[in-house]
UniProtKB/Swiss-Prot annotation:
A motif ('HIGH' region) lies at residues 31-41. It comes from Desulfitobacterium hafniense (strain Y51). It catalyses: tRNA(Cys) + L-cysteine + ATP = L-cysteinyl-tRNA(Cys) + AMP + diphosphate. This is Cysteine--tRNA ligase. Coiled coil: none annotated. GO terms for biological process: cysteinyl-tRNA aminoacylation. Its main location: cytoplasm. A motif ('KMSKS' region) lies at residues 267-271. ATP binds at K270. It is found in: Cytoplasm. It comes from the Bacteria. Its cofactor is Zn(2+). Monomer. Binds 1 zinc ion per subunit.
Amino acid sequence: MALRLFNTMSHQKEEFKPREEGKVGMYTCGPTVYNYFHVGNGRMLVVFDMIRRYLLYKGYDVTFVQNFTDIDDKIIKRGQEEGRDPLELAQDYIGEYFKDAAALNLMPASIHPKATDHIPEMIEIIKGLEEQGLAYAVDGDVYFAVDKLPAYGKLSGRTLEDMQAGARVEVGERKQNPMDFALWKNAKPGEPFWESPWGKGRPGWHIECSAMSLKYLGSGFDIHGGGGDLVFPHHENEIAQAEGYLHGETFARYWMHNAFLTINQQKMSKSLGNFFTVREILEHFPGEVIRFYLLGTHYRSPLDFDDENLQMAQKGLERLQTSIRLADEALGRQGQNSADAASGQKLRAAAEEARREFAEAMDDDFNSALAYASLFELGKAINAHVQAYPYSSEGLLKARATLWELADVLGFDLAKPANQAEAGNQKLDQVMELLLEVRAIARKKKDWEMSDLIRDRLKDLGIVLEDTPQGARWTLK
């Protein structure tokens, strides 16, 4: 099955055909670094990390570019509030970004360009637009003239008339059209600035991504991604700038956007003040669980945030980790191979079926939610095999390797515990070892009441004991 993805530009699923066979160029709009990123931003970051990983799994050579907006009105305002240099503040939050990104198991981008390192490229594009009559300068500001580009609005599906009717923009003497947007902003006292043909100033937000993506990926690159809130105006304006500068040449071939994360059915955003940063959530849940939660719903479907859903995600991840642990225990045991060839073949077939179903789900617009089902089915097959043949390695090695590999494609290390810290998992193992030892002593003394009490209380806590000829084993429900 060929890989198909939903292209926002065409509003339908399309077969993915890269610009260059075997290679993929991807660009996603990274954070504006004036604070820790919130879990709504985190969804976008995790989604496109997952997409990148799956493309790598399919054998593509992926160049993944994700920028940092390190100069912006919000950064300047935050710097003024804290009495700090805005560029230093942005650099500090870039460092904090990488800490939270590591917790979510985000692969570092191939290139992480910063806006302030690419001012010359932005100026070059603005000059080109001005030469073509697509931009105009007013007292040190430069604006893009949207009515000079007939295709403006093609990504969002809006006409210029509709935009003007719904615009919350006051028509001032400076703009020729209320929808015209800033390419370059004249410097205000106390703000960072760069020299330009229009005087001292700084770039507008939209020009930054156009310049950086074109520099590192060239025109017609494969995938441009971001959150659904960026379709308009940010991505619409990126297209206008880039394709205007390129004389109509295609800027990016596939546009992908994830749906909003909501709280009580209301979009999560910093502007609304109804957000949680990933840093805050990491105080209560590990990054693996947050990631598992974010990918448990198809990326184009809205996702409502609450603790209960995170707890369910933690249990789901623990189920997969338990399957790996049981497989490792069985593979590490000494004893006779008690499984027959048929049972081993059945487990190998389950592994092959899981791989097929996983690929089918992911090839259908990266349906990670459906891909989860293939992992859980394989986990169940491993558990059943280990229970029936506790000393057998027949087919188990392949099944274990397949489960681990497919989970890794989604960015999960099933050897890493889903609880708050590695030490917590080790302590659980140690406590269970002690309890099983106490229970074994009770059974040896024929103290069945104590033995059953331990078993029943553990069951109430979601821990199931199984008595086997080789001793008691425990699993998380």
